[in-house]
């Protein structure tokens, strides 16, 4: 073990004949340090890290990410790595640095070579297992290390697939709701459309877009109402009916809440501009 200020570092004992296949260069734990920074131009290693506490910033080949507690990140071999702790909330993280043909193949085979930041992915358990093997100083450990490394890549792969699924569902939900602007909102129709329960649907939509499906539809209705007020001569009552509000008074109250003025005031203000 090599203990630097604010870091606990281990080198892993490996048999030399396995080093071309996979080489574990370094592993350990970085403790909170607001001055912590690493620069690694054209990195010769892949870096896999899990943030246990705090947060920080990563720059990798022109892209910037902001990992926080509970996130993992995967910095690619051959790229410029620059990362550092947040000064107000410096991170505690666990890491491994690896290289070799096997790692290259795993990254490509699992489809993770294009992703650096894994939000909410906990690789802490696997990385700590590798740190413990290094701490013990075992020599005949390559197969165990490879098994753990494979678990890490599989979890990263699953995380990407989950994000792709969520992103696809998000677009599907939005597309469906966009057809409901002039209809009465029925949550059960959206749930049926994506084959999810109401609680699952609301939770998923809010995770992706930060608002509930109902709020999304309401915002869209008000945006369309603004267009109708400017571009048509429809009365407020007719617009309320067209957008399936229960009555013009409820519509006017919602409009004022969202737009900061009544529908009539909104129309007059745009007539004056013309």
Q: Where do the PLM segments sit?
A:
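Short hydrophobic/aromatic patches on the structural cores and recognition surfaces of FHA
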Residues: 54, 70-71, 201, 225, ...
């Amino acid at each position: 073990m090599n203990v630097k200020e604010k870091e606990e570092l281990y080198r892993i004992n490996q048999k030399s004949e396995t080093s071309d296949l996979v080489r574990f260069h370094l592993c350990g734990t970085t403790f909170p340090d607001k001055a912590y920074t690493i620069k690694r131009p054209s990195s010769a290693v892949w870096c896999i890290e899990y943030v246990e506490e705090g947060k920080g910033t990563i720059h990798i080949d022109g892209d910037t990410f902001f990992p926080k507690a509970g996130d993992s990140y995967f910095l690619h071999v051959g790229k410029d790595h620059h990362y550092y702790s947040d000064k107000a909330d410096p991170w505690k993280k666990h890491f491994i640095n690896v290289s070799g043909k096997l790692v290259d193949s795993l990254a490509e085979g699992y489809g993770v070579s294009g992703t650096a930041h894994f939000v909410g992915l906990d690789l802490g358990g696997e990385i700590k297992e590798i740190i413990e093997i290094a701490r013990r100083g075992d020599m005949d450990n390559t197969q165990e290390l490879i098994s753990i490394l494979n678990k890490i890549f599989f979890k990263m792969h699953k995380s990407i697939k989950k994000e792709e699924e969520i992103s696809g569902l998000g677009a599907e939900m939005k597309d469906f709701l966009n057809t409901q602007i002039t209809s009465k909102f029925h949550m059960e129709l959206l749930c049926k459309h994506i084959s999810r329960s109401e609680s699952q649907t609301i939770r998923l939509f809010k995770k992706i877009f930060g608002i509930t499906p109902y709020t999304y539809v309401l915002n869209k209705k008000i945006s369309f109402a603004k267009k109708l007020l400017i571009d048509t001569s429809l009365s407020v009552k007719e617009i309320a009916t067209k957008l399936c509000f229960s009555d013009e008074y409820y519509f006017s109250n919602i409009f004022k809440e969202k737009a900061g003025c009544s529908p009539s005031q909104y129309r007059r203000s745009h007539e004056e501009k013309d």
